[in-house]
Amino acid sequence: MKILYTNFHSGPDIGGHTTYVSRLAAGLSKRYRIAIAAPAGSALHGLADAMPNVSAHAQDFPSRVTRLPAAVRTLRTLLKREGFDIVHVNGSADHRLVSLASLFLKRKPRVVFTKHNNIPISSFSARIRARVTHHVIAVCKHVENEVKRSPYGACSVSTVFNGVDTAHFSPYDPADAARHREALLGPAAHGRILLGSNAGTASYKSWLDLVRAVALLPPEVADRFHIAMAGEKFSRSQQTELEALGMTARVTHVGSLRDVRDFVSAIDVGFVLSTRVETISFACREMMAMGKPVIVSDYAGLPENITPGVDGWVVPPAGPQALAALLHKLAAGEFDLPAMGRAARAKSQKSFGLGPFLESTAYVYRSTLPPQALGHELHGLM
């Protein structure tokens, strides 16, 4: 089986789409012939270029109509030359371009589309793309329900939960974790509960709700907490609010990280508090795999990760007051954080692993193809 993965994101940071595609490509490259088409200079193109048994192709997915013809020609040439069995698209821009590039091809690939986010599906444009889509993958049950209510409901739909490498994302030795914590915070590391997130700093992540919650606490309780963030530089408005709340000294920003494990090892409690866009969150699952209980907002598929009070907590979206109440309990020692971390790790090993993620996705591919196309599979290599 020959598979082409496409992704339109052009930035250098590793986001959820990049993580998703790169893990599938690396995991399935011993079984199938894998190629990735992504913009030159993007994080995904760079990762693909370094992967063994994966071919990387520089491909733009422009939104401007004037740039579409050249991009369509480039992609059509690739599709015609390589004869892919499956093209797995991951967003509206690459989905649209694949649809256009496949027109009039004698041998058209089967198109699999993963719905990663919770952005509403436009009925008109989705109706057009659904006609050339053979299977839709939802990354959580919430998204599956949304997809089935959309024009894509006419397609075959499966839920395949995002998987993480639980051997790669695993708890650190306590001494190593303490060393990374000291390097991150210095003297502020001692006697404080470190709340951290590798989910990013975009506005829809609503991480400022946690800052607002700490600001609501009495000074002696607030002093028990420090917040650490990994991700892009704070926006001007975010920085302005930090300063207005007097919280600048209580927040540490480490920037964008290629490898988040040292950072995650240093924290006590993770959080993903999104109020838009988010679905299941790789970051949440990575933190849980590393033995960290996680606070999530009751939004989209985020609660599907958590057993409340066992391996994390679910709070109302955009609810600093509810967060502040939870922080009071954390400061008072009402939760056994190490035990909750062990429960998070155990759940990740049982439910979040790469194996089911890869096998379920491969099953979608096989079910989408006619029997004769399965001869492209490389037997015995996985």
Which residues are covered by each model-predicted region?
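Conserved donor-binding/catalytic core segment of Leloir-type glycosyltransferases
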Residues: 4-6, 188-205, 211-214
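A conserved, positively charged/aromatic
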Residues: 106-141, 152
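N-terminal strand-loop element at the rim of the active site
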Residues: 5-15, 20-23, 27-67, 156-157, ...
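Carbohydrate-associated surface elements
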Residues: 142, 163
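Conserved acidic donor-binding segment of nucleotide-sugar-dependent glycosyltransferases
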Residues: 308-309, 313-320, 329-335
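Active-site donor-binding acidic/aromatic loop of nucleotide-activated sugar
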Residues: 236-237, 248-257, 263, 313-314
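Short, structured helix-loop element that forms part of the nucleotide-activated donor/catalytic region
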Residues: 43-50, 226-249
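Short hydrophobic beta-strand element within catalytic cores of glycosyltransferases
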Residues: 37, 293-296, 306
